[in-house]
């Protein structure tokens, strides 16, 4: 049968197939490296380089198996024996319908299934060409069932693996020993699955015919050798790297503390102890010397230590006060009157606030007379003023106001303090402390220690803490860093083997029909066509892949190296097994199922359920939408173009 008159259809098919492969790379490739980019173990550029290598390799070695299902398993091609040109037009229509919808979805950042697209598009053109009789419905039912089985199976496997990792590694006080012991097992499992997949599916391509037991033995042997290599070389290197990083962090922290301790307290009048203050604990910095108790008596502490509350918090700072004749009440330097006459504060020398404030006082001394609104610029001086209080208007012993003026005096002091707090600057704050110091030297201020407060309640467990997402420690991050890269490459390899058929399956059918002049397509899938599809997928990844990577790697749920490893390994294992038995499962479904399962286990609130709902709806919308586009193109070809060719 002369097929030269349909050469234009083959050329058009090659162009559309590349566009389809481009759309597959722009959308579905996020399933492979989206979690790796989201967890930060690889950059987007590194992900594109690795994916280009493994997507192409997987498409060549594993793509032929699934390509046969796409070409022959969805429709009965024997019904087109007498109308070969109709089947060729149908393959072109299927590619157009699938490509258009995937490009639209990629633009909208919707992660959809390329398998859904091509299956729906194939059914769409068949319904237009010969009606429902051309569709093998039982095969379609199996495919639809796999769409639900794959996310559930992948999610279950990811969940179980993550629970085990969390139980034996992440929850340990020191996760490094168990993590290093598990590394050879993790690497061996990943390598074994990968080698078995290549040998089982790719052996015919390489001209090898091996029994199942031989393939299993080879896979086990390679995995064992790789595990031995990891145990002898990778684990010691990883242990040294983790130890070195921890030691470096400790050294930097120690050096920072030592440099801060060299700053003399005299440079910080804010923390200058007033005359008459009792000796104080090293961990508590008094703003002033004392506070008056309600009875007007002084309380001193033996040994020069402040009372301390449980759980490491100081009960109070010493605080200077001036007596007021208002019914046994006093007001502190911050001008805040309390019923019991006491104001309690806490400032620790080892706190970051104290150290940062010392730096700011030393390096950023403002000019006198130029106060600034520190509250507006979030300076540490303002924060400390809010914590420690501002010295108010102290009164001398001889300047006792009349009883009717007492309340006004307290109110004026409070207003003055608030006004100073609002427009506080370093100079005004320190001047107020200096004024109080002069008053103390002249005997105008009584210096007393604040009596202890009632013991605070022990910290309660916040139920919301259980809902917070877990984060990997630096050691765990290093342990799973390379593992996630390896499993991401493994997932990319599996993705190339499974999803290249979505782009190249119709093109292979079109090429074989043109070459053989028959619809049976007896020849094997040409390797160069699989490579052509892999190149198209990589191009789509580089140009447009980052759009859906954002959705899969960050928007759906936060990813860490440990959770990303479990997601990659379990979902890739599911995809490879499905590819080896010829079942075109959706890598999107497998990855989304794993991401949601692990995210839900890590934290009930970590999953964006609204986004997951949209993705789930898109799974059902994709088939009819792609079928509708394909049916429209098919109707145009068989009724508007082919009759005139």
Curated annotation (Swiss-Prot):
It is a multi-pass membrane protein. Glycans are attached at residue 81. Its main location: membrane. Residues 275-320, 448-471 are annotated as: Disordered. Keywords: Cell membrane, Glycoprotein, Host-virus interaction, Ion transport, Membrane, Phosphate transport, Phosphoprotein, Receptor, Sodium, Sodium transport, Symport, Transmembrane, Transmembrane helix, Transport. GO terms for molecular function: phosphate transmembrane transporter activity; sodium:phosphate symporter activity. The chain crosses the membrane at residues 6-26, 47-67, 87-107, 110-130, 143-163, 191-211, 214-234, 476-496, 524-544, 565-579, 587-602, 615-635. The modification Phosphoserine is found at residues 253, 256, 259, 268, 316, 379. One of its GO terms (biological process) is positive regulation of bone mineralization. Residues 1-5, 68-86, 131-142, 212-213, 497-523, 580-586, 636-645 are extracellular. InterPro entries: Phos_transporter. It comes from the Eukaryota. It catalyses: 2 Na(+)(out) + phosphate(out) = 2 Na(+)(in) + phosphate(in). Residues 27-46, 108-109, 164-190, 235-475, 545-564, 603-614 are cytoplasmic. Belongs to the inorganic phosphate transporter (PiT) (TC 2.A.20) family. Homodimer. This is Sodium-dependent phosphate transporter 2. The gene is SLC20A2.
């Amino acid at each position: 049968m002369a097929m030269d008159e349909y050469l234009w259809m083959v050329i058009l098919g090659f162009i559309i197939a590349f566009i389809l492969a481009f759309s597959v790379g722009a959308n579905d490739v996020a399933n492979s490296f989206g979690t790796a980019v989201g967890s930060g173990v690889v950059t987007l550029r590194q992900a594109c380089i690795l994916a280009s290598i493994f997507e192409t390799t997987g498409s060549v070695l594993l793509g032929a198996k699934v390509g046969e299902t796409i070409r022959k398993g969805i429709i009965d091609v024997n019904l087109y024996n007498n109308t070969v040109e109709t089947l060729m037009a149908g393959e072109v229509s299927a590619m157009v319908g699938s490509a258009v919808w995937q490009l639209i979805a990629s633009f909208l950042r919707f992660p959809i299934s390329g398998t859904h697209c091509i299956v729906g598009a194939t059914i769409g053109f068949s319904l237009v060409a010969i009606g429902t009789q051309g569709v093998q419905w039982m095969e379609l039912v199996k495919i639809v069932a796999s769409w639900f089985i794959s996310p559930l199976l992948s999610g279950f496997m990811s969940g179980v693996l993550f629970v085990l990792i969390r139980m034996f590694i992440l929850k340990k006080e020191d996760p490094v020993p168990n993590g290093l012991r598990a590394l050879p097992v993790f690497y061996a499992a990943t390598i074994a699955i990968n080698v078995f997949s290549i040998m089982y599916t790719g052996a015919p391509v390489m001209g090898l015919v091996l029994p199942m037991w031989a393939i299993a033995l080879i896979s086990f042997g390679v995995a064992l050798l790789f595990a031995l290599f990891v145990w002898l070389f990778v684990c010691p290197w990883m242990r040294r790297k983790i130890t070195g990083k921890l030691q470096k962090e400790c050294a930097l922290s120690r050096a920072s503390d030592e440099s801060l301790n060299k700053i003399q307290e005299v440079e910080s009048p804010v923390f200058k102890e007033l005359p008459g203050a009792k000796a104080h604990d090293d961990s508590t910095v008094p703003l002033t010397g004392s506070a008056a108790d309600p009875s007007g008596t002084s309380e001193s502490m033996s040994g020069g230590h402040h009372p301390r509350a449980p759980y490491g918090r100081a009960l109070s700072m010493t605080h200077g006060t001036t007596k007021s004749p208002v019914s046994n009440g006093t007001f502190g330097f911050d001008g805040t009157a309390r019923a019991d006459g006491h104001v309690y504060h806490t400032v620790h020398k080892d706190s970051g606030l104290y150290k940062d404030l010392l730096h700011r006082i030393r390096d950023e001394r403002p000019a006198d007379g130029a106060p600034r609104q520190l509250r507006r610029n979030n300076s540490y001086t303002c924060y400390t003023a809010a914590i420690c209080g501002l010295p108010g208007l102290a009164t001398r012993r001889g300047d006792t106001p009349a009883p009717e003026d007492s309340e006004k005096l307290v109110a004026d002091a409070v207003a003055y303090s608030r006004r100073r707090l609002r427009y506080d600057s370093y100079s005004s704050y320190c001047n107020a402390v200096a004024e109080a110091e002069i008053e103390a030297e002249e005997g105008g201020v009584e210096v007393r220690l604040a009596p202890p407060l009632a013991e605070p309640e022990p910290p309660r467990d916040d139920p919301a803490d259980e809902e917070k997402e877990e984060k990997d420690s630096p050691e765990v991050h290093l342990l799973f860093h390379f593992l996630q890269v390896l499993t991401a490459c493994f997932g990319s390899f599996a993705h190339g083997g499974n999803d290249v058929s979505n782009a190249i399956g119709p093109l292979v059918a079109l090429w074989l029909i043109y070459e053989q002049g028959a619809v049976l397509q007896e020849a094997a899938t040409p390797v160069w066509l699989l490579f052509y599809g892999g190149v198209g997928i990589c191009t789509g990844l580089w140009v447009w892949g980052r759009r859906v990577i954002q959705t899969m790697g960050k928007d759906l749920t936060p990813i860490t190296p440990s959770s990303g490893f479990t997601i990659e390994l379990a979902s890739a294992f599911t995809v490879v097994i499905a590819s080896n038995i010829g079942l075109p499962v959706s890598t999107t479904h497998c990855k989304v199922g794993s991401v949601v399962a692990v995210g839900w286990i890590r934290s009930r609130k970590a999953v964006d359920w609204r986004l997951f709902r949209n993705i789930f709806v898109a799974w059902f919308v994709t088939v009819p939408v792609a079928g509708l586009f394909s049916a429209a193109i098919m109707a145009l070809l068989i009724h508007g173009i082919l009759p005139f060719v």
